[in-house]
Amino acid sequence: MEKRWKWLKAFIKFVFIQFNQKQTSAMAAELTLSNMLALVPLMTVAVSLMAVFPSFEGVNTQVQALIFDNLMPETGLAVQEHLNEYVSKSKNLSAIGLGFLIVTSLLLMRSIDRSINALWETPTQRKGIHKILAYWAMLTMAPILIAASLAASSYFATLPIVSDLSGILTFGLPFILIVLAFSALYMVVPYTQVRFYKALIAAVITAILFEAAKYGFAIFVTKFSSYELIYGAITAIPIFFLWVYLSWSILLLGVIVCFGLHRFEVESEKHEHEFISVLKILQFFIQAQDKESSLSLEQLKSKFSYLHEQTLRGYLEQLLRLNFLAKLEGEQYCLKLTGHSLTIEEVYRRGNWRLPNNNQALSDEKNDSFSTPIEQANLEMAKALDVELVSTNSVNS
């Protein structure tokens, strides 16, 4: 139990450090602006898609109720009325106008994709037609799937077997649908492998945070009525902006939780200087080169199990940028130059690493081939730098 509690505390700390370091608040602000510009286009596209299917007639109201009742506090009702008015007017747009709405919606999809993949630290992005198809799938399939789920739930609710459970369904079904939507988002958007159960855990946490935020935001709006004195009839607009920003912050926090569930590990007892670790990684690649083979990420994780996966990936990214390594398909890596001609001095010079001191250079392994040359380098450096900072001849009287 104590070990799990220690892991949980370390994991929460990791999530919030990542949230701050990756400037997630700025991402949420950018997505809020994109969201506000694309809100009417998104609703127009969704309504148009559902109108294509006769069986979804009347489901549009239920979809809006699901979104506005479960993802927004009560103040969103005024915004919903105005949005419906704008959507009804947009139905009279020409083909060019409708195309503009679709492009605006796709730009929001692009912002979401870039933000989530930035939080996941994915080295590559979707390109060309794959990117367009992915965005179009997110844009078109989401409203259709939500409408289909609501239509199915309405049908099952009328069955005699489940009629007694209608109260539970009314409360639990929207929450389940939101969890599934977040799970799909956390699995599909990152351009990397995401485990379903970890995406589901992150989605449940995000949905719970949404419920708590919705409750707290409703209290905030009720208690602080000074907004109405300042903004008057347009009070709903700044409040809606604030809520959308809070919503994106929570959603991106869920992305970091999902990322952390894949990458986070409790700190190992063994501490090693980064330059020593990099040299050992390159030494392992030289051994693989002698066997004319590449190394997978799993092999590297197994060999350097005392390193966090995130730390190991960071070293690999640095070695890729310095042209020591080349990345192959399927997260395979190989040495980009002749290993036996590589020297410690070249690695140190090209990477601009900090040289470990003699205490840091010492390893638990008795036959560490790096300790002796690093100790000698430190001694030579100490001898060369053993000069007075300001000599008496250079001091101006």
Curated annotation (Swiss-Prot):
Keywords: Cell inner membrane, Cell membrane, Membrane, Transmembrane, Transmembrane helix. InterPro entries: UPF0761_bac, Virul_fac_BrkB. It comes from Kangiella koreensis (strain DSM 16069 / JCM 12317 / KCTC 12182 / SW-125). The keyword rRNA-binding does not apply. It is a multi-pass membrane protein. One of its GO terms (cellular component) is plasma membrane. Belongs to the UPF0761 family. It is found in: Cell inner membrane. PANTHER family: INNER MEMBRANE PROTEIN YHJD, UPF0761 MEMBRANE PROTEIN YIHY. Signal peptide: none annotated. This is UPF0761 membrane protein Kkor_1635. The chain crosses the membrane at residues 36-56, 92-112, 132-152, 168-188, 201-221, 237-257. Pfam families: Virul_fac_BrkB (PF03631). It comes from the Bacteria.
